[in-house]
């Protein structure tokens, strides 16, 4: 481990000259040691990205590079970025380097782990088909989650990705006796603050480790913070536990990679993304997996730029997931929340051999009815309902009831809506939708199905409306 000298600074990219025979390795962490620098107290860390030859390495600063100048001294650590792991991280908020940012003293952990780890070998993997009940009707019905699976919440700006994720945390993490890790990647600090207080009020803070690299931080932090959170989750998994791993937002991880790639001088590819997009996504996603010792169930929010699902970033994320929950602006505009599109959302678990014949038939019946309504919408807009055949009129009436019954009051939105949140079991969800599809609710007004939990509540509401 030798010392080097800064020779160039361009934003977050810093070039450092080392002796030719003692250059640091790729991904090695370097620290600023310049005595006259205010950064020395803060301990600015840099990560080696490229070896340019002649003893010069190109690094990314994991922190603000304001005030850096040529000639400053940098020391090699001889190892990649390592973060504390284990039980000492629970109930704490950390940054990308595993340093506490909650003003609650040092992290009580004896073990540190490098954030760059190989993915588990093929023979260590353990696929699972056990269902994970979420208590959210539309998700449990049309895109059920698997324990140890990977789930993506796709949506544009302001359609409810974070609220849906918070509700899933509320319903799963609180019922689930295991541990959770939350990685806030390039999102709003306010949301991280809300999340912390929510966990504190629910008395589950001692089961959650939180890692944040928020919007205002340099791209190096946002690029590596997902790996920091994942390293903590992997430690719990390797101890034989079932872990929930929440990431908000995977798109910001890609975006940080784009910023870093441009600063490193790589030629951009489609839509200006980095040429290594698929590889960077694979490096992260291949590690989020379940092994024979324990499982990681991952729920990831994915921002969709300009509501375009064919954009390279969401498109690259799709191929790694078991369940995709697509949030639609059109459904949100109707006032139906959660704004999940039941026709666009899908899951590998929606198979009669996994969920059972009844669940499969009800889910497909719901989708067929909604698809028929979608096809008839243009005719209704031009000619009106009167021109439809009796069968089509019935399909439209049922579809509108289904659409409203897919809405549900959330626990985490109680403070905004004033309606108490509802948790609906899978059996109740299937029973309710089966009754609508089979025509047992044809006499009820469609308003009775809006923002209720079970089908029994819809019958109660219908009595009040009459």
From Swiss-Prot:
Keyword Ion transport: yes
A molecular function (GO) term: ATP hydrolysis activity
Family matches, as InterPro entries: AAA+_ATPase, ATP-synt_VA_C, ATP_synth_F1_bsu, ATPase_a/bsu_AS, ATPase_alpha/beta_chains, ATPase_F1/V1/A1_a/bsu_N, ATPase_F1/V1/A1_a/bsu_N_sf, ATPase_F1/V1/A1_a/bsu_nucl-bd
Compartments reported by the entry: Cell inner membrane
Listed GO CC annotations: plasma membrane; proton-transporting ATP synthase complex
Pfam families reported in the protein's UniProt record: ATP-synt_ab, ATP-synt_ab_N, ATP-synt_VA_C
Chief location: membrane
Catalysed reaction equations from the record: ATP + H2O + 4 H(+)(in) = ADP + phosphate + 5 H(+)(out)
Function: Produces ATP from ADP in the presence of a proton gradient across the membrane. The catalytic sites are hosted primarily by the beta subunits.
Sequence similarity: Belongs to the ATPase alpha/beta chains family.
Record protein name field: ATP synthase subunit beta
